[in-house]
Amino acid sequence: MTKSNGHNATMIVTGACDFSSSFSLASSSSSTVSVTTFNISSLSSNPNIINSSSTLFRSLSFSLIRHRSSYSRRSLRRLSIHTVHGNKTQFFSHSSTRTPPLFTANSTAQRSGTFVEHLTGITESEEGISEANGFGDVESARNDIRNVATRRIETEFEVRELEELPEEWRRSKLAWLCKEVPTHKAVTLVRLLNAQKKWVRQEDATYISVHCMRIRENETGFRVYRWMTQQNWYRFDFGLTTKLAEYLGKERKFTKCREVFDDVLNQGRVPSESTFHILVVAYLSSLSVEGCLEEACSVYNRMIQLGGYKPRLSLHNSLFRALVSKQGGILNDQLKQAEFIFHNVVTTGLEVQKDIYSGLIWLHSCQDEVDIGRINSLREEMKKAGFQESKEVVVSLLRAYAKEGGVEEVERTWLELLDLDCGIPSQAFVYKIEAYSKVGDFAKAMEIFREMEKHIGGATMSGYHKIIEVLCKVQQVELVETLMKEFEESGKKPLLPSFIEIAKMYFDLGLHEKLEMAFVQCLEKCQPSQPIYNIYLDSLTKIGNLEKAGDVFNEMKNNGTINVSARSCNSLLKGYLDCGKQVQAERIYDLMRMKKYEIEPPLMEKLDYILSLKKKEVKKRPFSMKLSKDQREVLVGLLLGGLQIESDKEKKSHMIKFEFRENSQAHLVLKQNIHDQFREWLHPLSNFQEDIIPFEFYSVPHSYFGFYAEHYWPKGQPEIPKLIHRWLSPHSLAYWYMYSGVKTSSGDIILRLKGSLEGVEKVVKALQAKSMECRVKKKGKVFWIGLQGTNSALFWKLIEPHVLENLKEHLKPASESLDNVKEAEEQSINFKSNSDHSDDCVNSEAHFY
């Protein structure tokens, strides 16, 4: 029923229906409403939607929205997608009778393996480029948003004109709020709304939020919505949350979109298909932000398993391309997700494009344990679909067969690659070298390496690494030395992996003098690394040069970038015990007890005898679990920088999640140091070899971390403790800076922080107590504390003794600032982008933009 007389313009839509066409009615306020006609015949032909309830959420120039929902467990609710053109709001809806099953990853998607780097040297053909753009364009997925089928519809919805409100004062105040709210920042906006608490109702706040969305002030609309949810009169509004989430998602505000999305889930409701679709696209549009791909996969999986939806082909393809394009990775998660996407495309009857087959074969070939059967199955399906195998597929096959050591299959695949007449990528030569190394034919491997040099005009870095590794295993000393010299002269980097292989070979052959020369050359041309130090230390202890071994050990211990490990301690301890140096052995033993390193069983027997003479008891087990002072200070800095704590409230235990960024130079160095410092606290599965420490590992679950969980992660969210000023030592500040700080191009220092505004103020005051002035801005949920000029120099002077040696040059502020440390001039910090906070929200010393 619709009335357009300007005094009682109310529209109520009920029932579940198939929207087939629409017409427009103009109200007296000159706003145009798009009203949808119903295809009644579809109800009888489609019994699945007879019990469905429906919702239409309309956005008018001045329209008040009231949402009444009636819930039925068996009914499907969907909000129709709409777009705004000028003064007209159009709604698009496509009926659908299909009921998709809940899918889980099939058995073929659960194979183990690791995801490795992309093929190098492969250039796409024009055909390949066009195909890649066709199957993986995020823009195509974004364009499909408006065409997403809507199968969850609310029961009843009412749209009223602003003029229909009986109280004139309410109309005036609402109009005034609609004008004022978009002009204010977050804190002032909340104060403004709080001042209206006495008269504002949910319908009023909903109207303001929708008005903000209509004028494209979506973040302001979100703030009004968030304020509304904190009021005691608030009732969940599915229509409003759906509209808000989709508007935020279309602007790529994935964090706020996810908050609203989670609000729907927390109410026991299933978001609409369009909301799922938009949120996935928002994440895929921000892949440069860490963790967005994982979140996109999580939402995609929920879309299918929880919502029972069948996504558009463009969404499948976009997510698949993002998985294939991801650099690096751990375990076989990417393969499982890719198999799940492939399974969904096939079972829903969508077209499987050529690049999907190619990408899936490529992912399988990257695994440590290759499933040749699955690869052959995909090849058969690819042929049935009428696709020819491209160069990328053939190279993937070459890699897979090389890992299995199948020389015959490699040669046959090599001929196929030659027949394609599209050039041989350098990585194909590396795979062929690996295949022959598996069968011990190093002469053939060397021949292939020389062919690569002729074919591409010089060997690649990966080619040098592979051939040197192969020849070191068969101990071809002269040939290895010749190749290493060529490698150094070529100027290619990194050299460290090859130096480590050569050092191992020299140690096995007993060529300790050559090993020492290789060690010295490595330090001159590469950054210091614990693996090469450990090999050199083993060599010194084996030849009995314990004095020099002690010096090298002390150098490792004093350099936080290298640090000592259980292996280096056991190596030196064995040397001291074999030579009868009991005093030095006791010192190493005490160090191992302090660091809680395990002592090798043969050494325990010797220690037991030596210490029994002095009536000392050998501690078979480490001390009771307790963090040292240094560990506590490091943990405070890391927690401020974003370290996460996962809690099990039932068992009252907590687990630290150590996570590092692969694309951060500071994190590459820092993860080694953190792994060594917290080794005794790490989960047994996290005790990896020194040279393959992952970018993510966990501590053991322990009640000792309860203090940190209570103060830094209450209720599973980051928070800043009230007593942070007591715990903010220079050591903690240094690790905070190394973990999440940034040095700008101008040499200023910016620190990243999550928590409440009050907590940030406490941190700012703590810095001011150390004579450092700072400015703060907020972006999303993250605060950025900036120190510029003299302030950055003072900060650096405070933390420099605790910064890892290899990071000092990388993190050191501008030299001009250091020259002016003694000047007391106050520096002003200007973050160019505006924040969500106004200047009046904090004290006068630390300004929030």
UniProtKB/Swiss-Prot annotation:
Disruption phenotype: Can grow only in vitro on sucrose-containing medium under low light conditions. Mutant plants show a pale-green phenotype, very slow growth and delayed development. Keywords: Chloroplast, mRNA processing, mRNA splicing, Plastid, Repeat, Transit peptide. It is found in: Plastid, Chloroplast. GO terms for cellular component: chloroplast. PPR repeats lie at residues 237-271, 272-310, 312-352, 355-389, 390-424, 425-455, 460-494, 495-525, 529-563, 565-599. InterPro entries: Chloro/Mito_RNA_Process, Homing_endonucl, LAGLIDADG_dom, Pentatricopeptide_rpt, TPR-like_helical_dom_sf. Its main location: plastid. GO terms for molecular function: endonuclease activity. It holds the Pfam family PPR. Residues 1-68 form a transit peptide. One of its GO terms (biological process) is chloroplast mRNA processing. PANTHER family: PENTATRICOPEPTIDE REPEAT-CONTAINING PROTEIN OTP51, CHLOROPLASTIC. Belongs to the PPR family. P subfamily. Promotes the splicing of group II introns in chloroplasts. Required for the splicing of intron 2 of plastid ycf3 transcripts, a factor required for the assembly of photosystem I (PSI). Involved in the splicing of several other group-IIa introns. May be involved in the splicing of precursor forms of trnL, trnG, trnI, and trnA. Required for the assembly of PSI and PSII. This is Pentatricopeptide repeat-containing protein At2g15820, chloroplastic. The lineage of its organism: Eukaryota, Viridiplantae, Streptophyta, Embryophyta, Tracheophyta.
